[in-house]
């Protein structure tokens, strides 16, 4: 049976990287977290990713080695075709996805896709963005405005205002509920 592709989305500062890092500490035999290929230095940001030059990225894309790819915030992002092998082997695969590119993921994976939108309250989102110190005040305000107006339709919502442990527990419960439903189809 084919696994589910869990497309985790959320605004910058919602805690996606922290959630994925915490999830990796849990023993999950049927859930794999996919790494992303990004045209960003390996030491930039907190995400565990594979850094590529733009040339390397375009070469991989041109050879159909990326299952999904997109451009956002001046960078190119991609997920390798290895996720298709994992899915066909029956593993669930979690991807740090893009809200704007959910339609692309939906078109490719259709009923195997489980879209989850990570949300936090505006106050907590502002605090997290200020604490990480990457954006100035106007950039933070722009990110808050985008977060408020851009929530994808037809996706499961996961609130990340609480503890990471609580959010990971809720995420795993949601994934396992969908696995049971998927197995009955």
Curated annotation (Swiss-Prot):
Catalytic activity annotation: alpha-D-ribose 1,5-bisphosphate + ATP = 5-phospho-alpha-D-ribose 1-diphosphate + ADP
Database matches in Gene3D superfamilies: P-loop containing nucleotide triphosphate hydrolases (3.40.50.300)
Transmembrane intervals: none
Pathway(s) where this gene product acts: Metabolic intermediate biosynthesis; 5-phospho-alpha-D-ribose 1-diphosphate biosynthesis; 5-phospho-alpha-D-ribose 1-diphosphate from D-ribose 5-phosphate (route II): step 3/3
Molecular function in Gene Ontology: ATP binding; ribose 1,5-bisphosphate phosphokinase activity
Coiled-coil residue windows: none
Keywords linked to the UniProt accession: ATP-binding, Nucleotide-binding, Transferase
A Pfam family it matches: AAA_18
Biological process according to GO: 5-phosphoribose 1-diphosphate biosynthetic process; organic phosphonate metabolic process
Binding site for ATP: 10-17
UniProt entry tagged with the keyword Hydrolase: no
Catalytic activity, EC: 2.7.4.23
NCBIfam families tied to this protein: phosphon_PhnN, PRK10078.1
Matches recorded under HAMAP family: PhnN (MF_00836)
Primary role: Catalyzes the phosphorylation of ribose 1,5-bisphosphate to 5-phospho-D-ribosyl alpha-1-diphosphate (PRPP).
Family, per entry: Belongs to the ribose 1,5-bisphosphokinase family.
Protein name: Ribose 1,5-bisphosphate phosphokinase PhnN
Organism annotation: Escherichia coli O157:H7
Gene: phnN
